[in-house]
Amino acid sequence: MTVLDDINAGAREDMEARRRLVSLAELKDRAAAAAPARDAWAALGGDDSTRKQLKVIAEIKRRSPSKGDLASIADPAELAVQYADGGASVISVLTEQRRFSGSLADFDAVRKAVDVPLLRKDFTVDEYQIWEARAHGADLILLIVASLTDAELRDFSQLTRELGMNALVETHTAEEIERAVAADARIIGVNVRNLKTLDVDRSVFASLSGGIPPEAVIVAESGVRGVDDVRHYAASGANAVLVGEALVSDATPRERIAEFTAAGAEAIAARV
């Protein structure tokens, strides 16, 4: 069993426990009553033909399987406000509890604190989680191609669109990019971390980004340690970067996001 397989199995067990407390029918009622989803596609520059600005998806993450504890984050809402003030286009909130110490309570607190689009960051293995995300006010969900069959990827993508949300469709190989494109993904992430082994290879992004249709929003995931990595991703075709560890471990995340945005814009300007 790979690391990803193990995480997915845990995510399914935890989801089933929640389903015993809150039925799918109840979630659908809550989703129907929720405020309309914010346009994460537009927030990430999807409708901007120039795409001269690098967008930052700033992540709230207490721990990770590869690094262990990262930050205690006693008040995720306060951190989210700092992210928003720094110019984050989207805020990602981990809700997976076993490996990342996240929760839907964290997500709810952040949702009340900021108006920017939110990514409910979890390991989606069932449509229940998609309805759950919308019921809690999510605007964007994560679909990992390696975790899903083609039918699941297609069906989950369609349900996400029907609920007014967008999906960040995560890939790590050329074959997974082909599958994402076949599922009409509009926001495609390239994770330079292999979730089956947790190894990081930053060169993966440059080798794969050229295979993503130009109309898609291209997100570089993992491996951002500082502005040099941001410049590298932006120069290699990224429209956005997803950053977690480098922000939660920084005493001034607001300033760091502004630095990343500026560095990315410079790199984008140099490539065109």
Curated annotation (Swiss-Prot):
InterPro entries: Aldolase_TIM (IPR013785), Indole-3-glycerol_P_synth (IPR045186), Indole-3-glycerol_P_synth_dom (IPR013798), Indole-3-GlycerolPSynthase_CS (IPR001468), RibuloseP-bd_barrel (IPR011060)
Membrane-spanning parts: none
Enzyme class: lyase
Metabolic or biological pathway, per its Swiss-Prot or TrEMBL entry: Amino-acid biosynthesis; L-tryptophan biosynthesis; L-tryptophan from chorismate: step 4/5
GO biological process, one term: L-tryptophan biosynthetic process
Keywords: Amino-acid biosynthesis, Aromatic amino acid biosynthesis, Decarboxylase, Lyase, Tryptophan biosynthesis
Chain coiled-coil ranges: none
PANTHER family hit by this protein: INDOLE-3-GLYCEROL-PHOSPHATE SYNTHASE, TRYPTOPHAN BIOSYNTHESIS PROTEIN
HAMAP family per UniProt: IGPS_B
Protein name as annotated: Indole-3-glycerol phosphate synthase
Organism: Arthrobacter sp. (strain FB24)
